[in-house]
């Protein structure tokens, strides 16, 4: 018994000191939570990952358009600050999840996926900008 206690204490100590690699990921919030965040925060980017045609038909004011299909393995010049808060959306939420995963793999650290514009309760605009 005297031998087991020091061994258990050592294992406990070592397991507490072990560093666990935090899995890099993105957060998901609702559109309503996104609106509240946009009212409080500054310096964020709203990223629409739909096609250019979908973007021109209707998008969130101030959003920039980078199609999900164009997000790959290279840095994105329109998003130079990898620590900047980026709110990502698409039409229904599927492409925004894919794009968020790709952005995290590219080293972006502050990605929030907000779903699809179909659920957006706020104002939308048309055109290329």
Regions found by a protein language model. Name each.
Residues 10-11:
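Residue-level signal for mature regions of secreted extracellular proteins and peptides
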Residues 45-48:
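Structural scaffold elements adjacent to functional motifs in cytosolic proteins
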């Amino acid at each position: 018994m005297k031998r087991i206690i020091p061994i258990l204490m050592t294992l406990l100590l070592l397991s507490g000191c072990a560093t666990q690699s935090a899995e890099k990921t993105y957060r998901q919030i609702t559109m309503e939570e996104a609106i509240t965040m946009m009212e409080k925060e500054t310096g964020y980017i709203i990223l629409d990952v739909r096609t250019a045609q979908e973007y021109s038909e209707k998008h969130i004011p101030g959003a920039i358009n980078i199609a999900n299909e164009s997000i790959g393995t290279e840095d994105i010049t329109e998003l130079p600050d990898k620590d900047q808060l980026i709110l990502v959306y698409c039409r229904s939420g599927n492409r925004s999840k894919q794009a968020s995963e790709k952005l995290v793999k590219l080293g972006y650290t502050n990605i929030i996926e907000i779903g699809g514009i179909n659920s957006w309760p706020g104002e939308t605009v048309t055109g290329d900008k």
